[in-house]
Amino acid sequence: MAWTVEDAPWWTRAVVYQIYPRSFQDSDGDGVGDLRGVLSRLDHLEALGVDVVWLSPIYRSPQDDNGYDISDYQDVDPAFGTLADLDELIAALHARGMKLVMDLVVNHTSDEHPWFVESRSSVTSPKRDWYWWRGPRDGMAAGQPGAEPTNWHSFFSGSTWELDEASGEYYLHLFSRKQPDLNWENPEVRAAVHAMMRWWLDRGVDGFRMDVINVISKDTALPDGPVVAGVWGDGSPHYTDGPRVHEYLHEMHRE
């Protein structure tokens, strides 16, 4: 489809300014940037010709990965302010003809998110299949070196699998061990994510920048990757731009 300048969607022609709240502007002198600090700089951003503010994660988080480990998708971390502060920011941006796009991470959650806490609580938990749980390799005991379900190397360090000693099973985490991967094969997971996104859109958010969205679709066979250094393999061919990623994104757009 060809667009003219006049009818092109706003996101194709906007000037987007990313704000990393923690280091942008501190309003209360505690050494941490916050939403009220962002509010105080909107006139400056407007004068720069900014159309869209892209806000890096401000959700409630243990901050293991600078807010990309989300423990509550529908709340603001107290370090940055409150939901009321965010509502005020949305209104102030819209009053200036500007839009707000929020960073959103749905490949994984924090291990402190209620979804994972429930998933981890029992092998029979209704949310067990919301994450990727697997037993050790055939013929090996849980915790034994090399018993991880695959040889994939984490983006951070070590294996992508963390042993849960209580159940004897491992959970998948492409990033930090405190960032377990959601199982997008499960339609309940996708429905929960869609509902959360609608909640933010209803609150006035104009869109999302989807972090690491290209890794949400995994090869369900979970094959080993080629060993590139030491004992760990490169699993990226089995989870990057996976077989259902476009299906999931089209579904997200429809919902």
Report residues per predicted region.
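Hydrophobic residues within beta-strands of alpha/beta enzymes
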Residues: 53, 208-210
